């Protein structure tokens, strides 16, 4: 690349791609600087929202092995690079777009898999990772409790039967003596 500034920008974008497991491409046409600042704040610490140059982003994505943005890099573009919970970032973008319809989600990727606008909306409708994990843990705990009760039922029945048999044998032994 002839221009060192452009080479540095591509290197920075490649670094952002490599340090994030998800990214959401948006068009921000019509948003003010104050609105972009609000969006960055809403995304939190686990996501970085960067206004990008389309050509340099295409080069960085291609060099990073990311094909999710092919054909979508047109107009004023910005990317939310997500290193934390992708569901929370998608929710933040969805909520911001409700109040600011100028923000348009174009697509993205999650763990190397390309996602279109509708898939990102579905991602935003999911519950957070912590809630999903707690539901799985609760279901597993309930299943284990049921299994333990099933295993204990025959065991306790066997113990009661053995106690009754021993009592009967003791009773017969006392009567014989």
Swiss-Prot record:
Keyword Oxidoreductase tagged: no
Among the Pfam families in the record, one is Ribosomal_L10
Q: Which GO terms describe its molecular function?
A: large ribosomal subunit rRNA binding; structural constituent of ribosome
Q: Which CDD domains match?
A: Ribosomal_L10
Kindly give the NCBIfam families that the UniProt entry links to this protein: PRK00099.1-1
Return the protein name: Large ribosomal subunit protein uL10
Which organism encodes this protein?
A: Kocuria rhizophila (strain ATCC 9341 / DSM 348 / NBRC 103217 / DC2201)
Give the similarity note: Belongs to the universal ribosomal protein uL10 family.
- Its job: Forms part of the ribosomal stalk, playing a central role in the interaction of the ribosome with GTP-bound translation factors.
Of the GO CC terms on this record, one is: large ribosomal subunit
Establish whether keyword Membrane is in the entry: no
């Amino acid at each position: 690349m002839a221009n060192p500034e452009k080479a540095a920008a591509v290197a920075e974008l490649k670094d952002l791609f490599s340090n994030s497991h998800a990214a959401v491409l948006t068009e921000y046409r019509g948003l003010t600087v104050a609105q972009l600042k609000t969006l960055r704040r809403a995304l939190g610490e686990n996501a970085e929202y960067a206004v990008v140059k389309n050509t340099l982003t295409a080069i960085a994505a291609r060099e990073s092995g990311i094909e999710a943005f092919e054909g979508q890099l047109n107009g004023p573009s910005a990317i939310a690079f997500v290193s934390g919970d992708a569901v929370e970032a998608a929710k933040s973008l969805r909520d911001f777009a409700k109040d600011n319809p100028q923000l348009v989600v174009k697509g993205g990727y999650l763990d190397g898999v390309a996602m279109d606008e509708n898939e990102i909306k579905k991602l935003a409708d999911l519950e957070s990772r912590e809630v999903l994990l707690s539901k799985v843990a609760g279901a597993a705990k309930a299943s284990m409790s049921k299994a333990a009760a099933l295993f204990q039922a025959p065991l306790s029945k066997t113990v009661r039967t053995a106690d009754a048999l021993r009592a009967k044998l003791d009773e017969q032994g006392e009567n014989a003596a």
